[in-house]
Every structure is written in C-alpha cells, then in structure tokens.
C-alpha cells in the first residue's frame, strides 16, 4: 500500500517544521491526541497516514502565510509577481495537480524572496512552500483513499 510510504515520506517535512516553529509540538499533539513529544508525534505519523495528514494540516498553511507576509511587507515584490496565478488565492489541493506550473511560480517567488530578504528569507519561504506541496499531495491521496483529514 502506497499510503504508509507517503506517511513516512512526510516525516522529514514534519521534523524540520517542528525544529523551526516554537509551540508546534504542543499544537500537533493536541490535534492528533499524542504525547507532547517530537518522538511520539513522529512515531504516530510513521504508523498512520491519517495522523500524518492531520499533522501536516497543522503546518500546511505556513507557505501561504509566508508568501502573503512577503507581499504585504514588500509592495515592490507584489508588483514583480503580479502575474502569478495564486497571488490572491489560497493554495488549493487541486492546484498541486500541475506541479510544473507550481515549480515555475515557485522559482519566481524565490527570485522575489532573494530580492527582498537575502538567502535566509529565501530558504525559509522555500521550505514553507515545499511543506505546502507535501501537505496537499498527501491530503489528496488520503481523500482518494476515502479518508477526510
């Protein structure tokens, strides 16, 4: 079955989000009914794709939030990126159906992040957007299998 493999593949994204976001461990633990411990959360994620989906749901908005913050803080970037199809809309699960388009847009977002914030801002934004890809990709697979996360 593919789903447990996908759940295990989500572990690196979850680990990096936990390391980068204070308070995320307790929020995830409350959402999945786990002990407030990174190792307990990761064990639950590896064993259950639904738990993986719920866990990723707790971090899934980070890329969009970082993107919106970038636009709000830097109007010149909003102008640079005015042709991006997702500039005013939340990233939807069906958007991931065309990863090629997403990759092109992600490159433009990276250019903008580099323009306004240097490498650290670029890395943070790219990681956040990559987490969104993993979250929505897993959510679509869970939905296809009859789960609703």
Swiss-Prot record:
Keyword Plastid (UniProt): no
Entry GO CC: T=13 icosahedral viral capsid; viral outer capsid
Keyword Repressor: no
Keywords: Capsid protein, Outer capsid protein, T=13 icosahedral capsid protein, Virion
Major site of localization recorded for this protein: virion
Compartment(s) of residence: Virion
Top-level taxonomic group: Viruses
Record function comment: Assembles to form an icosahedral capsid with a T=13 symmetry. Drives the penetration of the inner capsid (core) into the cytoplasm.
Subunit structure: Homotrimer.
Protein name according to UniProt: Major outer capsid protein
Gene source species: Pseudomonas phage phi6 (Bacteriophage phi-6)
Gene from which the chain derives: P8
